[in-house]
A protein has these predicted regions:
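Small cysteine-rich, disulfide-bonded extracellular modules of the LU/uPAR three-finger superfamily
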Residues: 1-128, 135-170
Length: 170
């Protein structure tokens, strides 16, 4: 299932339709063998996440989406999600952006990504869900994913999560 949300912006009788979607790339590295498994999954932008994006565009709020949280819950995602089912913790990371020239069909857009590294001692539980937050401690989930393949994180593994928000004009 692909989760994509539409935002309609009107300025002086001009109209631009924007599409917003998220993708997570999860690299699981076995530190004993060097073997890397990569998982890629599209995920849900919540209503709160859309509000944050629009508040950032208009300058109403300067709080940024910068925390990746891990959880063990498995309840399906919903537009109204503001928390993970069972959060184990979160990490704050640097946010980077790049201009994406084309997403097919000639649509130009902007991509923001947050790359988070979890070392061998962090969050050694079965990862079933992840989310992106502004503070990581409250009801401020901007996007959430329930992993199609749960990850059994132990001290043998490090994990790098690259979470992308992609906004394109349509």
């Amino acid at each position: 299932m692909i989760y994509m949300r539409d935002i309609l912006m009107r300025v002086d009788n001009m109209e631009t339709n924007l599409k917003v979607y998220c993708e997570a790339v999860i690299e699981v590295r076995n530190e004993e063998t060097g073997e890397i498994e990569t998982y890629r999954q599209r995920n849900l932008v919540t209503d709160y996440g859309l509000t944050k994006i629009l508040q950032s565009v208009t300058g109403i709020d300067t709080t940024i989406i910068s925390r990746c949280a891990i959880g063990t819950g498995s309840t399906p995602t919903d537009w109204s999600d503001v928390l993970l089912d069972n959060q184990d913790g979160s990490r704050k990371q640097r946010v980077e952006t790049e201009m994406v020239t084309s997403f097919g069909g000639g649509a130009a857009g902007k991509k923001v990504w947050i790359k988070t590294f979890f070392n061998r001692t962090e969050h050694n539980v079965v990862w079933r869900e992840m989310g992106m937050f502004t503070t990581g401690i409250g009801a401020d989930c901007c996007s959430r994913i329930v992993l199609t393949t749960p990850i059994n994180k132990t001290s043998d593994y490090t994990i790098t999560v690259t979470w992308s928000y992609i906004i394109v004009s349509s």
